[in-house]
Amino acid sequence: MAENQYYGTGRRKSSAARVFIKPGNGKIVINQRSLEQYFGRETARMVVRQPLELVDMVEKLDLYITVKGGGISGQAGAIRHGITRALIEYDESLRGELRKAGFVTRDARQVERKKVGLRKARRRPQFSKR
């Protein structure tokens, strides 16, 4: 690809995203599809655009993204994390702004495992006194 591109890896839940940024006109490609084609939900699209809107670079950069694993929400979060890391590699002075917005920190929350004797991770079977 281009010689002046910047890379960031993002993770969220069980999703992992690889984000490549290069100067351009605001084109976002996710797994060979446009942002609108890939994410049907508007909330997921908003999550992906958040770091770019914060630093006002929506129209200045082209993004090429590959993402695997998880669902829509996890993938959107992973892409946001990856974009943030790539932006920091692109311009270190953006770190403070992105940190303040909470985009730099990896969201470490994972699904809690189901326990034996319970219906879900914490949901117990109904208790009958008599």
UniProtKB/Swiss-Prot annotation:
- GO cellular component entries: cytosolic small ribosomal subunit
SUPFAM superfamilies referenced in this protein's UniProt entry, alphabetically: Ribosomal protein S5 domain 2-like (SSF54211)
GO molecular function term, any single one: RNA binding
**Top-level lineage group:** Bacteria
Question: One GO biological process from the UniProt record?
Answer: translation
Q: Can you tell me which family this protein belongs to?
A: Belongs to the universal ribosomal protein uS9 family.
Q: What is this protein called?
A: Small ribosomal subunit protein uS9
Gene label: rpsI
